[in-house]
Every structure is written in structure tokens, then in C-alpha cells.
Design a protein with these regions (language model features):
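Hinge/lid segment of periplasmic solute-binding proteins
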Residues: 87-132, 143, 256-261
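A ligand-binding cleft/hinge motif common to bilobed small-molecule-binding domains
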Residues: 89-94, 236-253
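Periplasmic solute-binding protein
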Residues: 111-147, 168-191, 272-280, 356-358
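Extracytoplasmic/periplasmic substrate-recognition and gating elements
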Residues: 248-313
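Long, aromatic- and glycine/proline-rich binding clefts that accommodate carbohydrate-like moieties
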Residues: 306-365
């Protein structure tokens, strides 16, 4: 394998990552529900992102018809949950969750996104997540302005200077600082834990400071309204953020995902890809949890979740005869590009680490 050209290596990687949706198929234990266990009586509480609670309610109703003795409800209290789906899990909190090696076919997942505690798997990735600049081409077309692709492009754009790009703290870390730190030698584990050396972090923050000082990128805790109304040249945010506001965009909008804006010409475009990951608490009824997790990762339920949420799955699924949203094509075209280096990351940052990183980022934007 060491003799393969970088291009061939990229193509092989895409077979199991960027084209994950299309390469999978129904496996023996993923196509239908099992009938055994229908007599199991237990309660499960699920905590997940409010955005896809409705989608989970539909899955729960379908599951309940097969297992009427299992009571499953949603909760907003993650400490009360038997099943938690979250995009961040620190090592200390992870101690409260069970081993999941036998609850799903591990080969169906992106290996780097499986959350491990030592040699044991305690988290199964459900949805992919990533951050980068999203651009609506419509305002650029109106102003006859070129759409920027690289770092130098935004400095040379009068449209961007007049309509600064916006970002929140998480977008700035995952879409700007982390990719630059990777270019300087940081590993996926380094940026996932947030435990970056002072030297690496300084290099990652240097270009962000230059961008902040120029005024062409501004920090905002609520940039969505400006993006929808075309009052900003771009939004440095997560895929989930875009999905939430997509239905509010003008019909003539054309959304473009451009993670390379943090990189200069000639530099690698690094794209950290994370996941919303499923964890099962040790206190949960083991049999009930196993039944639900197995059912959740069946092809039929994953397809139902894709349809309802428009979120890209982190597990192989057979999508034949199933139309995919336009936003999917934009996302996967970037993910599959040979110009982009995909770096899979499990976010294990502690609250204190996130707070420290936020303070550093805030200091760059202080007037």
C-alpha cells in the first residue's frame, strides 16, 4: 500500500468515507427488526439534539409497535438519559457509559469516529458533522463579485470587506483554528482533546488574529439572520447550522460549502469531520438498550432519519431508489474532493478546555 500514489490512496479512502452513503447495503442484522425480546419490559430515556427530536419520535413509534412492553421517552436532561446522543464526550464523563461492541456491526462505521475507551467501543457515530465557510452565491451574483475560495481571496474582495463573514466560537475553532493546527503538525487526537501545545496553538491562532484585525471576519453568537438576509459574505458554521436555516433561504439561493478559505493557495485544505455519537449509560437496561440500538441502526430507520433531518449518516446505508437532498450533494462533493484532506475526529474536549479555547478566541476579537 505504501507504493500507491496519493491520488489512488484518496480514491480508496473515499470508498469508505465520502461515498459512505452509497457503498453500504443491508446486512443480515440491519434490514429488519428481530422478533426475540418482544416480551422485554423496561423503560429507556433518550437525550438528543432538539433539532432531531421529532425524527426520533417517529423511530420510537415504529419501534414501539414491535416492542410494546418497552417504554421509550425523550428527555432534555442528559444526566437522566439511558441513551445519550452528543457531539462531545470528555474522558471523565465517558466512564459512565457501557461497552457497545456487541450492539452493532462495527464494520459498518467509519473506524476513526468510533468512540473508544481503551480497547473498548463505548460510542457509535450516528450523524456526520463538520464546520467551514458556507456561502450563498446569490448576493455575490447581485453585486457581480467573485466567490472567494482561499484565504488571499477574501482579503482581495471588496464585497467581503463591505459584508464581513461571520462566525461563532465553535465555528472558529473547528473551521479555522483546527485546520490550521493540522497543517502545522497537530494530530486528530490533539484537536479532538483540545490539548494543543502552545506552539501549535499559536500558529493556528496567528492567521485568525490577522483575519480578525482586518475586520473581514467577525465573531457573532447569532449570525443566522444576517446570512439568510444576504447581509454577510459567508458564515463559518457547522453543517447542522445550515440545515436549520436552509428552509428560510430565498428560493434563488445557491449554497456553497468552502472550507478552504482558511488556507492559502498551495496549502492543504484540512477538513475535520466529527460525529453526533450514541452512548448507552451503564445504568440502562442492557437488553432494552441493545434492542433499541440494533433497531435504530437498521437501514430503514437510518433512511428515515436522513429523510427527516437531512443530516449525513456516519454509518453505511443502502440509498438506492432514495433521493438525496441537494445539500447532500454539495456536502459530499467537497468531502470527496481530492483537494480536501478529511481528518476524522472524536471530540473529547472537557468543559474547562472548551472554556480556555473560547477565551483565547475571544481575546483575538476584543476591540
Amino acid at each position: 500500500m505504501n507504493r500507491l500514489s496519493p491520488f489512488i490512496k484518496k480514491m480508496l479512502a473515499l470508498a469508505s468515507s465520502a461515498l459512505l452513503l452509497l457503498t453500504g447495503g443491508c446486512t443480515a442484522n440491519r434490514g429488519v427488526y428481530k422478533t426475540e425480546g418482544s416480551s422485554v419490559k423496561a423503560e429507556l430515556k433518550i437525550c438528543c439534539n432538539p433539532y432531531y427530536e421529532l425524527a426520533f419520535e417517529r423511530v420510537i413509534r415504529t419501534f414501539g409497535s414491535a416492542y410494546p412492553n418497552l417504554s421509550i421517552t425523550l428527555t432534555s436532561n442528559k444526566n437522566d438519559a439511558d441513551i445519550l446522543i452528543t457531539d462531545r464526550m470528555d474522558n471523565e464523563s465517558a466512564k459512565g457509559f457501557a461497552v457497545l461492541d456487541n450492539m452493532a456491526d462495527i464494520a459498518e462505521f467509519i473506524p476513526e469516529l468510533l468512540y473508544r475507551s481503551g480497547e473498548k467501543i463505548i460510542g457509535l457515530p450516528l450523524f456526520l458533522e463538520t464546520s467551514g465557510i458556507w456561502i450563498d452565491k446569490l448576493p455575490y451574483i447581485r453585486e457581480n463579485a467573485a466567490v472567494p475560495c482561499r484565504f488571499s481571496d477574501i482579503f482581495g474582495s471588496e464585497f467581503v470587506k463591505s459584508n464581513p463573514m461571520l462566525a461563532d466560537r465553535e465555528g472558529l475553532y473547528w473551521g479555522f483554528v483546527a485546520p490550521l493546527c493540522i497543517s502545522c503538525g497537530a494530530s486528530a487526537e490533539d484537536i479532538g482533546s483540545g490539548n494543543l501545545s502552545q506552539e501549535l496553538l499559536a500558529q493556528g491562532l496567528e492567521r485568525l488574529k490577522k483575519t480578525a484585525d482586518s475586520g473581514i471576519l467577525k465573531k457573532s453568537q447569532n449570525p443566522s439572520d444576517s446570512f439568510v438576509s444576504g447581509k454577510t459574505a459567508g458564515w463559518l458554521c457547522s453543517y447542522l447550522d445550515i440545515i436549520k436555516i436552509q428552509q428560510n433561504m430565498p428560493l434563488s439561493s445557491k449554497l456553497v460549502f468552502s472550507p478552504g478559505i482558511a488556507a492559502e493557495k498551495g496549502e492543504n485544505i484540512n477538513l475535520p469531520v466529527r460525529a453526533d455519537t450514541l452512548f448507552v449509560a451503564k445504568k440502562a437496561d442492557k437488553k432494552a438498550a441493545e434492542l433499541f440500538v440494533t433497531a435504530l441502526f437498521s437501514d430503514s430507520n437510518i433512511l428515515r432519519l436522513i429523510t427527516d433531518t437531512h443530516l449525513p449518516p456516519a454509518v453505511k446505508v443502502n440509498c438506492k431508489n432514495h433521493s438525496l437532498p441537494e445539500i447532500f450533494r454539495e456536502f459530499y462533493s467537497v468531502l470527496s474532493s481530492t483537494a480536501v484532506k478529511t481528518v476524522y475526529v472524536t471530540d473529547s474536549r472537557s468543559d474547562s478546555t472548551v472554556s480556555q479555547l473560547n477565551n483565547l478566541i475571544d481575546s483575538l476579537f476584543t476591540p
